[in-house]
């Protein structure tokens, strides 16, 4: 026997522990809890290495699942030379494509169409630092507390918005910088309409800015397009549509946007 295989030699001679299978099963059951704990607690270099390892494992698993699913889907049967014999009824559908393949391709096509439909005019925008976005407000008798922030960019707040009590309001959205309407341009009709804003869908800078309703360049907003008289295929009037802000509202003093059609 080769060197350094004394463990295997001992197992062959004396066998394993009586509770080996039970311990092995319990260890495998604990593995998921250990991975979850490591994912939450590991920091720094070890955390990065762990995340990298888990990512590669998930990619390999997805590839394995995909190949397994593709192996299940059968394509059309290879046509034989026509020898003049009539096929029985139960063999007539062999020449048709498999339904699973057709469904898969149709789903992919719909995803591509959806991506094209919502292609935005500004795919990339310049990042904004927190120092530029927030201004520190000093509070307290000696002006020593600095836990309040004031947003220096234009924002949108809903109709039923009420400020929190002053002592508890951490982030201030000034009334002078609040916007309710936007100059929306329809790219196909080539018209610009002053439409009310319904909400902020996504701010590319940060999810927190989306929640606060900050209006910066590249932000996706929802506007009320009922004035344009757009109608769906079913005959219903379109109420809200998305538009992307194309200017810097804090510099121009207004919101200019392009409708996503």
Swiss-Prot record:
UniProt main location, coarse: nucleus
InterPro entries hit by this protein: NSA2_fam, Ribosomal_Se8/biogenesis_NSA2
Motif, Nuclear localization signal 1: chain positions: 15-22
Region named Disordered: 1-34, 61-85
Cell membrane found in the keyword field: no
Biased composition (Basic and acidic residues): 7-34
Cellular component terms (Gene Ontology): nucleolus; preribosome, large subunit precursor
Location within or outside the cell: Nucleus, Nucleolus
Subunit structure, interactors included: Component of the pre-66S ribosomal particle. Interacts with NOP7 and RRP1. Interacts with RSA4 (via WD repeats).
Protein name: Ribosome biogenesis protein NSA2
Source species: Debaryomyces hansenii (strain ATCC 36239 / CBS 767 / BCRC 21394 / JCM 1990 / NBRC 0083 / IGC 2968)
